[in-house]
Amino acid sequence: MATTKYEVTYIIKPDIDEDNKKALVENYDKVIADNGGTMVESKDWGKRRFAYEIDKYREGTYHIMTFTADNADAVNEFSRLSKIDNAILRSMTVKLDK
């Protein structure tokens, strides 16, 4: 089976303190690794202002992960967990070209 490259962008609530934000990012990086993904890059884009209000917030901390996976298990598990997690305002997954 061919390896697919994915990019996940997610927005963390701005009122999360640095220690909890770091733990959250490490947790989601681990979710990818535990489900067969290989992390290429995980970087913080910092706090940015939104064009419109999301859940009563006007800004959020953006984080981007790039990883490869043989199947969609890592993407599906990340998606499932990020929908449950109250600290994540939005997330988007994109399948990248080779």
UniProtKB/Swiss-Prot annotation:
One of its GO terms (biological process) is translation. Keywords: Ribonucleoprotein, Ribosomal protein, RNA-binding, rRNA-binding. The keyword RNA-binding applies. CDD domains: bS6. The keyword Methyltransferase does not apply. Coiled coil: none annotated. InterPro entries: Ribosomal_bS6 (IPR000529), Ribosomal_bS6_sf (IPR035980), Ribosomal_S6_plastid/chlpt (IPR020814), Transl_elong_EF1B/ribsomal_bS6 (IPR014717). Binds together with bS18 to 16S ribosomal RNA. HAMAP family: Ribosomal_bS6 (MF_00360). This is Small ribosomal subunit protein bS6. The gene is rpsF.
